[in-house]
Amino acid sequence: IYWFDGEDELHLLNALSSSAAELTAAVDGITADISSDPSTDLYGAVIKSTKIAEDLLKSNTNVIGAASVVLFTDGTDQASRYRESDALNAVKDANRNISFFTIGLGAEIDTEVLEGIGKTASVFAANKEELENTFNQISQRVAEQANSFYLFEYCSPKRDGSGENNLVIRLTNGSLQGAVQTKFNAKGFTGGCE
């Protein structure tokens, strides 16, 4: 968990952890005097958090990896350290296994900008009373994204590269249906064959 103000840096609140209790304690420990800078470096926070997520994925190449950037703000970019276009390009050009979510609070937000940054999902709360529901909505979407990665292993008889394989995956969930199809050469594949 990182927090940001108008300074040209993200401040670490708590390192990456799977402990809900540890993360909750870190958030509960936030006080009103956490920052003395009243400005908002929103675009810088987007650029820097995207880089952190990219680096995390690059450091774990031996596993199926995904990351989520969840940005919570009650304002627009006031620091003018970075351009809006640079922040939106960071999101657009990011690794496709990074999901972007935004949560906006209050009347001083720019919903259009936040929807551009939160390309996976964006939610807005008019006041602090609506925040819990808003956070729960994003939490559910983050969990859905995290649970959408699968490892598929198949021992192809064409491991010598002598032909092309055609893979079709279909999914039906109630009335929802989806499919993806791809062709690949299995030269050197060993998954599922051992």
Language model: regions and residue ranges:
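Envelope-exposed proteins and targeting segments
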Residues: 65-68, 96, 101, 148-150, ...
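VWA/integrin I-like adhesion module and closely mimicked acidic/polar interface patches used
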Residues: 44, 68, 72-126, 130-141
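Surface-exposed acidic, glycine-flexible loop patches that form ligand/cofactor-binding
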Residues: 51-63, 158-161
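Second-shell loop/turn segments in exported
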Residues: 8-14, 28-39, 73-78, 101-102, ...
